[in-house]
């Protein structure tokens, strides 16, 4: 069988990774066609669907029906929603469910959900039988443009976010844009922060386009699919150039060093801060820190902050509800960042909008002094 033809309102992004190459399909109605798209690409006839309690009532039945129609026998596991599900405890639960479903190497684990479910299910797919097929059906904007693409999987520990995991590329990504209409405005904005990130890394024209087209993206106009496709292509290009994050892929972590520290500081409490909001604040801080180090103009930092604020995203630590722990606690979280090498702090800094770079010898004293100025305490 061959994959179905791309519809007029869809986009396809191909990720050319040799034997591990895969397609990202972007457009409305893809969940209903998932069975056909999967069966056209994978030999296996079994699947284990991993989802969460928020997504399951909306899309699980439709996905199961579609798989059955195309001859794929599927079972499902529904987990609690939220960042705390990315744990060893739930990883064991997922692995047990996949093995109980008798999923073999040519069969598939299907992640139906946002980034949490994708990271967790992908980790399980990477280690069960030393690797089974994996299909991402991301249901949030953030997961459609970021976490579903590139093969990073993992869980959180008490030491920090995403510190235990494997690289396991998906075999197919189905980004059904129709599901985005069910997201809360807050969740949609949080995902949009990752869209902005691609412009700030090395695509200034994309950032300027986003400034003009945010309203059309928000309301589901033609710019929405264009923004998602551009983001997926940007990430695919980086992943192909540096799959295992030994070089340029680290640029995708713009805003994430500060952001992850803030997530840890709020104990991953989504009522206070969700991942995309942490990234938004982190990107502003990265631009401000770059300006402080005389690497970039303060005007660029102000422009980034202005756009994110206009969208409705938090842009300062003061925007986070509740008290934050002291700067020393934030510094301890930063010291656990995956990009730390030889004990030296590594940040993604910038020379301006669309001019990000890896700075691999940042003085901790400079970071601590900067955070002390920005800390609301």
From Swiss-Prot:
Coiled coil: none annotated. The lineage of its organism: Bacteria, Pseudomonadati, Pseudomonadota, Alphaproteobacteria, Hyphomicrobiales. It is found in: Cytoplasm. Belongs to the sugar phosphate cyclases superfamily. Dehydroquinate synthase family. PANTHER family: 3-DEHYDROQUINATE SYNTHASE, 3-DEHYDROQUINATE SYNTHASE, CHLOROPLASTIC. Binds 1 divalent metal cation per subunit. Can use either Co(2+) or Zn(2+). Keywords: Amino-acid biosynthesis, Aromatic amino acid biosynthesis, Cobalt, Cytoplasm, Lyase, Metal-binding, NAD, Nucleotide-binding, Zinc. This is 3-dehydroquinate synthase. InterPro entries: Dehydroquinate_synthase, DHQ_synth_AroB, DHQ_synth_fam, DHQS/DOIS_N, DHQS_C.
């Amino acid at each position: 069988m061959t994959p179905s033809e791309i519809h007029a309102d869809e986009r396809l992004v191909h990720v050319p990774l040799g034997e591990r190459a895969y397609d990202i399909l972007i457009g409305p109605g893809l969940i209903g066609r998932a069975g056909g798209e999967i069966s056209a690409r994978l030999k296996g006839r079994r699947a284990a669907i991993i989802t969460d309690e928020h997504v399951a009532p909306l899309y699980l039945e439709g996905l199961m029906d579609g798989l059955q129609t195309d001859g794929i026998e599927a079972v499902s596991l529904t987990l609690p929603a939220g960042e705390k599900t990315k744990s060893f405890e739930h990883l064991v639960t997922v692995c047990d469910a996949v093995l109980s479903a008798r999923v073999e190497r040519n069969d598939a684990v299907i992640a139906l959900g946002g980034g949490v479910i994708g990271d967790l299910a992908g980790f399980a797919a990477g280690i069960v039988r030393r690797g089974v097929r994996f299909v991402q059906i991301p249901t949030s904007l953030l997961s459609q443009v970021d976490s579903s693409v590139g093969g990073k999987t993992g869980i959180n520990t008490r030491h920090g976010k995403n510190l235990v995991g494997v690289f396991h590329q998906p075999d197919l990504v189905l980004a059904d844009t129709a599901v985005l209409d069910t997201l809360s405005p807050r969740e949609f904005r949080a995902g949009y922060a990752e869209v902005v990130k691609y412009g700030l890394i090395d695509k200034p024209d994309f950032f300027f386009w986003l400034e003009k087209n945010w309203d059309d993206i928000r309301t589901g106009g033609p710019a929405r699919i264009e923004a998602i496709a551009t983001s997926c292509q940007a990430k695919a290009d980086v992943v192909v150039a540096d799959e295992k994050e030994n070089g340029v892929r680290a640029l995708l972590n713009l805003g994430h060093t500060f952001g992850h520290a803030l997530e840890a500081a709020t104990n991953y409490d989504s009522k206070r801060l969700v991942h995309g909001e942490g990234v938004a604040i982190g990107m502003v801080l990265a631009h401000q820190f770059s300006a402080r180090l005389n690497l970039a103009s303060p005007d660029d930092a102000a422009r980034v902050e202005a756009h994110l604020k206009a969208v409705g995203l938090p842009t300062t630590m003061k925007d986070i509800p509740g008290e934050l722990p002291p700067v020393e606690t934030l510094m301890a979280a930063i010291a656990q960042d995956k990009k730390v090498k030889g004990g030296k702090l590594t940040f993604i800094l910038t020379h301006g909008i669309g001019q990000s770079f890896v700075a691999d010898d940042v003085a901790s004293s400079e970071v601590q002094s900067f955070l002390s100025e920005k800390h609301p305490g």
